[in-house]
Amino acid sequence: MIQKNAILDVADNSGARKVLCIGFLGGKKSATVGDVIVVSAKVAAPKGRVTKGKVYKAVIVRVKGPIRRLDGSIIRFSSNAVVLVNDQGDPLGTRVFGPVRKFPVGEFTKVMSLAVEVL
């Protein structure tokens, strides 16, 4: 579960390294895997597409807290991570690093296709 003012890792090659969660879409108080959030880039690579201080949308791909699946198994990751997306839901980067949690059918298919491992 991600709350406001959480510092998150960026799991793509858009140029950002760390982002700050500044809001949620849909009037929610917190977010989990698959939710779109509003972030501000805090640490960025000098020659990336993303500049420090600008506001972007991102989809959450990993959370530290346990996620229970329908079959009863529990999955958890070692870091909280996001992938930066545009208004249409397409990723800003061309690669996604690390494992990604599976999204519902029809949501963020391009993010899942770029990921190395989908759990």
UniProtKB/Swiss-Prot annotation:
One of the GO BP terms on file: translation
Stretches that traverse the bilayer: none
Pfam families, per database record: Ribosomal_L14
Keyword entries, A-Z: Ribonucleoprotein, Ribosomal protein, RNA-binding, rRNA-binding
Gene Ontology CC terms: cytosolic large ribosomal subunit
GO MF terms, alphabetically ordered: large ribosomal subunit rRNA binding; structural constituent of ribosome
Function: Binds to 23S rRNA. Forms part of two intersubunit bridges in the 70S ribosome.
Subunit and partners: Part of the 50S ribosomal subunit. Forms a cluster with proteins L3 and L19. In the 70S ribosome, L14 and L19 interact and together make contacts with the 16S rRNA in bridges B5 and B8.
Family statement drawn from the similarity comment of this UniProt entry: Belongs to the universal ribosomal protein uL14 family.
NCBIfam families: rplN_bact
Record's protein name: Large ribosomal subunit protein uL14
